[in-house]
Design a protein with these regions (language model features):
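Ordered, amphipathic secondary-structure segments that act as subunit-interaction surfaces
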Residues: 13-27, 258, 266
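Short, structured segments at the rim of ligand-binding sites
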Residues: 156-615
Length: 615
């Protein structure tokens, strides 16, 4: 093993390391020699099977101290994020003076604690940010002595300040903002317009990488597209003229990929079973979409995938089963893809979705279908008393339906609005602004992230609503509102929320919780693994780097409010992580520097410009 220290280049050589299980006489001999030669004595504990309880870890650390350790080294094996977080809790206890209770500050040994295994790899870097004097790396990729080790070259790159070129903004003075259209709404509407023979108009159009990706897909299917200011005109070809499409490129969009996989099977059927390939680039190639593959196979479609879940997909033949059942626990997007394709089949289909998740987004799909003239029936079933989240939903979908052209106002994006709503609430709570007004929002949007308003209210913020100028939507239907958020003159308080159906809020909720008094609880961590990054890990690692007190236990994340500080953090090529870290940096005394912010263009290319404006 090589050492990589916080000082980059400082290597601790005068150390001797002995296991906690060593016989007492052996330990005494080594301890005596260490003192004689002026070496640090490291007393180590390793668990190669798992991670002990927190109480056990505390006991181990204290036992290491009683054995004379100048530095306590505790290395566990993490099988999940909860294991890794439990080991990292030792640094909180050390900072609070609770790890070595009763010992004077000068008598407290230093601590190196991290987790082995791929699930714990990030802790080898994070431990340096939390106070460890050094960590362990391998000389090269072929020289690793334990699972999850970084190479020395990788660690030095991660610790080098020159690799964090973007310095975030240091203040927030905005009082009003109009965010762009929802990519969730826009991508559904773009695909529906392609399936409708004739012209559809999509108003309030604002391009981002994911929406442009959908537009390019339907252009490749033969649709004619024109833009008139903020209105997108789509001349759809109709579902029956899609048979010539043999390759679909979805960019980095998980939603677009999942919406198109069932449609690709229909295209294959129209073309006599000829294969259709779906591929993408960037982060989407690292996302395991096994649930989409499994759903297609359940429907009778032949689908091959790299490593049984990774793009590219090769899809052959159409949906042959008239009764289809699969789990929606991991993603509602695959369900939405089926709901958009099943009406095109010759016969009626019954689709049963067990463990449905992100139900508001299913409602959004159903609203889109209704706007484009498609009908279906659904029935929700509950375990026990009716209410809450259904255990399954059964959709009865008539066949031989045709999409009809429609004019749609692409409503503003609540996911994007959440960053400004939280920034406005925190800034007003700190006395920096009077709050913020979100202009031209839809309150019955069915976008799950509208829940941010309820969360802010529970924190003690005031949320008020006023009608927006009717000219904002032109001749398109729908009422728009201006939403004002303020917490002037008061401290925000901790909140509890189940974010299972709105997992995209998790990163910005971590920012909000860090500025609330008390400990906030956010459920739904299990929904975070298959995003642009493993968001459970990235939220934990990057916000802890900025000083946040975060713990993850099972499906719940706990964030205790307290001051954040600046630091060098990584976006992990994840737009929501990048934007949330930038918002966090608005309220830190030192700058927050990021390695990359280009990923923000995926959903919100105007974010930095809107955030920088003072109006």
């Amino acid at each position: 093993d090589y050492y990589a220290s916080r000082g980059l280049g400082d290597v601790y050589k005068r150390q001797v390391d002995i296991e906690i299980e060593a016989p007492d006489e052996h330990l005494e001999y080594v301890r005596t020699l260490a003192r004689e030669y002026g070496c640090w004595l490291i007393v180590s504990f390793h668990d190669f099977e798992g991670t002990p309880s927190l109480d056990e870890l505390k006991g181990i650390a204290r036992l290491c101290r009683t054995k004379g350790a100048d530095l306590v080294k505790i290395v566990t094996t993490a099988w999940n994020i909860s294991d890794a977080a439990r080991t990292m809790r030792l640094y909180d206890l050390q900072a609070d003076g609770a790890l070595f209770e009763g010992a004077a500050a000068a008598e407290r040994p230093q601590l190196v604690a991290f987790s082995m295994g791929e699930a714990g790899k990030f802790t080898r870097l994070l431990c340096l940010k939390l106070g460890a004097p050094y960590t362990y790396v391998s000389a090269g990729a072929s020289n690793a002595t334990a699972s999850g080790q970084y190479t020395r070259e990788e660690m030095e790159r991660l610790l080098s300040a020159e690799n964090y070129p973007f310095e975030g903004f240091r203040e927030f003075r905005r009082t009003t903002v109009a965010v762009p259209c929802s990519k969730s709404v826009a991508q559904r509407a773009v695909l529906a317009a392609a399936l409708a023979a004739g012209e559809s108009r999509l108003a309030n159009y604002a391009p981002c990488n994911d929406i442009v990706g959908a537009v390019e897909v339907i252009r490749g299917m033969g649709c004619r597209i024109a833009s008139d200011g903020t209105t997108l005109h789509i001349e759809g070809v109709g579902a029956e003229r899609l048979g010539r499409c043999t390759k679909i490129e979805t960019g980095e969009s998980g939603l677009l990929t999942r919406l198109l996989t069932p449609l690709a099977s229909h295209i294959s059927a129209l073309n006599g079973g000829a294969p259709v390939e779906i591929s993408g680039h960037g982060s989407i190639l690292k996302r395991n979409l096994h649930e989409a593959v499994a759903a297609l196979r359940e429907a009778g479609v032949h689908c091959s995938a790299r490593e049984e879940g990774y793009l590219p997909f090769r899809i052959e033949g159409g949906i042959t089963r008239r009764e289809i059942s699969f789990s929606g626990r991991e993603s509602s997007q695959t369900v939405s893809g089926f709901l958009m394709t099943l009406p095109l089949l010759q016969d009626a289909t019954v689709l049963t979705v067990t463990e449905p998740s992100s139900i508001p987004y299913l409602e959004l799909t159903l609203r889109t279908l209704t706007r484009f003239g498609v009908r279906l029936n659904r029935e929700a079933f509950y375990d026990g008393v009716c209410g809450g989240t259904p255990s399954k939903i059964v959709f009865s979908v008539p066949g031989r339906q045709e999409y009809r052209p429609s004019d749609v106002f692409l409503e503003a994006d609540w996911s994007s609005a959440a960053y400004f709503a939280v920034a406005g609430a925190v800034a007003s709570s700190l006395g920096r602004t009077e709050g913020i007004t979100l202009r031209n929002m839809r309150l019955d949007s069915l976008q799950a992230d509208e829940k941010i308003l309820d969360i802010l209210r529970s924190c003690g913020a005031d949320v008020s609503v006023a009608p927006a100028d009717a000219s904002a939507r032109g001749d398109m239907p729908g009422d728009l509102q201006n939403i004002s958020v303020t917490a002037t003159g008061r401290r925000l308080k901790a909140f509890e929320v189940d974010a299972t159906h709105c997992p995209d809020l998790f990163p910005i909720l971590a920012v909000l919780a860090a500025h609330c008094d008390g400990t906030s609880r956010i459920a739904g961590v299990g929904r975070l693994t298959q995003k642009e990054s493993n968001r459970a890990e990235t939220i934990y690692a990057e916000f802890r780097t900025l000083g946040a007190r975060i713990d993850i236990r099972g499906d719940e994340m706990f964030v205790t409010g307290g001051p954040l500080h600046g630091g060098d953090v990584r976006s992990h090529n994840d737009h929501r992580i990048a934007m949330s870290l930038i918002v966090a940096g608005l309220f830190t005394p030192e700058p927050v520097r990021l390695d990359d912010v280009k990923c923000i263009d995926k959903s919100f290319p105007s974010f930095l410009d809107l955030l920088a404006r003072q109006e």
